[in-house]
Each structure stands twice: as C-alpha cells, then as structure tokens.
Amino acid sequence: MTTIGTPLSPRATKVMLLGSGELGREVLIALQRLGVETIAVDRYDNAPGQQVAHHARTIAMTDPDQLRALIEAERPDLVVPEIEAIATPALEALEAEGVTTVIPTARAARLTMDREGIRRLAAETLGLPTSPYRFCDSLEELTAAIEGGIGYPCVVKPVMSSSGKGQSKIDGPEGVAAAWEYAMSGSRVSNTRIIVEGFVDFDYEITLLTVRARGADGEIETRFCEPIGHRQVSGDYVESWQPHPMPGTALERARQIAGAVTRDLGGQGIFGVELFVKGDQVWFSEVSPRPHDTGMVTMVTQWQNEFELHARAILGLPVDTTLKSPGASAVIYGGVDAEGVVFDGVDLALRVPHTDIRLFGKPESFVNRRMGVALAFADDVDTARRNAAEAAGRVTPRAV
C-alpha cells in the first residue's frame, strides 16, 4: 500500500526533479495533484518547473559536490532526473548509500545520459536491431568511419545533446567538416565525442511510451501507450500525433524491443522509446527514462497523460494507458531573441475547434526555442494535426 504524506509537514512525501523545463513542469504539477511535496532543480533561475514547485533550487547539476550537497540537505524520498546533463556517478553513490531512490534507477540514468551508453546496451548487450554506428573523437575519426563502412547518407549527433541540437545529416564528403563543427556546438557538456549512424531507409519513426508500474499483485508490469507519430526538423520535434497506424506485426515487434530495453534499465516510471519502422521491420533508435517531448500530445489523447503516468508509476500507484481520442500537438516557437516575451493571438488560437495550448513560461526566448505547444483532439488524426498547426500558428511571441 502506498502512503503519501502532507506537503510542507514532517511526514511529507518529497520528490526532487533534476531539470525543470516544460516536461518537468508537467510532472511537478501531476505530483502535486497527488499530494507530493516537490523540489525543482535547474541550472538557471525561474525555470518553468521552478515556477510551480514548492521549492526551487539552482545548482550546476553536472557538479557532483553541489548535487550531493543538495540531495543530502533536502533528503527527498525520490530523485527524478529530467535531463541528461547530470553528475550520474554522484547519483549512483547516493543510491548505494541509501540516501535516496533514483528514478527509474541510478544505473538507468547513467546509461541513458549519453547516446553511447544506451546504444551499446541495446545493440551489443541486448542484440536489438539498430542502424550501423561508430563513435568518434575527432574529425579524422569521423571521416574514417564514414569511408570505412558507414557510408552516405549518414547522421551525426553529439553523444550528449537534447532536442536535436548538434544533429545533422551528411549526404557527401563535402558536408563532413560542417557536421562535425555543428555537433561540437550542440553538445550539452564539454565533450568532443560523437556518434555517426548509417542512414536507415525507414517509412516513419514513432515514440512508444512504455510504462513500468506496479500491478494489483505488487509486481512490476510493463504497459504500452498507443504509438505516437512525429515529424522532426534538424532532429527537433515539430509536431506529434497519436495514434500512429502500424501493421500488427510491426507493433508487436516494437513492443518487444521497448520491453526488452526498459526491462534491462529497470525501476519504475515512463520511458520514451524511439523506433524506426519500415513495413514490418523495426529498429531501436533511442530511449529516455522520463516523459518525452513528442508525448505532450497525450495531454489531449489519453485518460492519463505521460506526466500523470510517470507520477503514478514512481509512487507505486495504478496506471491506465487507455487512449480516449485521436489528437495532435504542434510546437509554438519563440520567433525572437528576447527576455520576458509576451504572447499575442492566444484568443485566436483557442477559437480553433477542440484545441488547447500550453505556454511554458521560459524566461528567455530564442528564434527556434520551443516556448509552448498547441494541442488538438478530433475524430481523426489528420483533422487534429491541421487544427493543432493552425492554433500554433496563431500564437505570436513578441519582445517588449
């Protein structure tokens, strides 16, 4: 039986989020609705999640001493990483010492903090199908890897980055140097290591939200949400929709792959498993042990959205992955480089049938920064996609 205390009391159930962007913000809201005391941590002040949490803390999360000191001072029941750029060795040590519990596990946080750990686990340990790949530490190694078998076209990514930063496709030798420089500029930390992947000729890519939660008998069960289709530009999510139609054989294979990798990572919570699909063939791409940006569509498509599923699962509560309606999401971009922007056209956006919006409250806007998302539900995915895109296009951030 799960017992939850009263926030801001000696018996409070305390959860600390490491990373407090738009996804963390929604997790914090879901936790608070269940009576949890929340601590939002980020590298800068006034991050979206810090605006709604009981407590806000700002530290360099890649500094193991700062991270340990904060966790030892706050003594949260659970520590929930929401980003990759964290001093994971400190989390592993604190978990081993019994200071706190890391979600889903400290090992999972370490393996998924960069593309190398999770790719080696999936391809080399679990034997899951992936694109051909090499890891490189220099432009010379990258060139040799491509010429030595990866070939063109190929995709280059920093081993540690988020939201598509530093990711590019190379169609020929003339693009190699520029791709290397772009990858270096997009890395989340001072790391010169990249992954180069052979291009998979897929029909589409999906996110399969996979939930590990306790069932009625107390044992951990794996459940799957309906597949989420998404469109990316330069590796960054632009729109997503649910459900994405798939042949039964491909869907079963996708669930087998997602189940295998999340079972090995262990723990409880939601995982965003990214997969390439061509006909009945499925390839593993990446996994995040947390809610996924493409999964924001679940705020209008599921009875329990991905943030509520994560909150429930980590607290040991029952989950329900049932789809209630087809729907879509579309990104609202900053459009300007400015602090403290205002948003025009919110009323116009909400006049589009069956739509809603989320503005993330980011303190600073950039031209291509994700500042919000439009959501729409409809009788079919195509209508929902059109309506979400229309609503997003009516919102205009403006510098003041």
UniProtKB/Swiss-Prot annotation:
ATP binds at R115, K157, S162, S163, G164, K165, G166, Q167, E197, G198, F199, V200, E205. Residues 120-315 form the ATP-grasp domain. Pathway: Purine metabolism; IMP biosynthesis via de novo pathway; N(2)-formyl-N(1)-(5-phospho-D-ribosyl)glycinamide from N(1)-(5-phospho-D-ribosyl)glycinamide (formate route): step 1/1. GO terms for biological process: 'de novo' IMP biosynthetic process. It catalyses: N(1)-(5-phospho-beta-D-ribosyl)glycinamide + formate + ATP = N(2)-formyl-N(1)-(5-phospho-beta-D-ribosyl)glycinamide + ADP + phosphate + H(+). GO terms for cellular component: cytosol. It is an enzyme of class 6 (ligase). N(1)-(5-phospho-beta-D-ribosyl)glycinamide binds at E22, L23, E82, D293, K362, R369, R370. It comes from the Bacteria. Mg(2+) binds at E274, E286. Its EC number is 6.3.1.21. Keywords: ATP-binding, Ligase, Magnesium, Metal-binding, Nucleotide-binding, Purine biosynthesis. InterPro entries: ATP-grasp (IPR011761), ATP-grasp_carboxylate-amine (IPR003135), ATP_grasp_subdomain_1 (IPR013815), PreATP-grasp_dom_sf (IPR016185), PurT (IPR005862), PurT/PurK_preATP-grasp (IPR054350), PurT_C (IPR048740), Rudment_hybrid_motif (IPR011054). GO terms for molecular function: ATP binding; magnesium ion binding; phosphoribosylglycinamide formyltransferase 2 activity; phosphoribosylglycinamide formyltransferase activity. Belongs to the PurK/PurT family. Homodimer. Involved in the de novo purine biosynthesis. Catalyzes the transfer of formate to 5-phospho-ribosyl-glycinamide (GAR), producing 5-phospho-ribosyl-N-formylglycinamide (FGAR). Formate is provided by PurU via hydrolysis of 10-formyl-tetrahydrofolate. This is Formate-dependent phosphoribosylglycinamide formyltransferase. The lineage of its organism: Bacteria, Bacillati, Actinomycetota, Actinomycetes, Mycobacteriales.
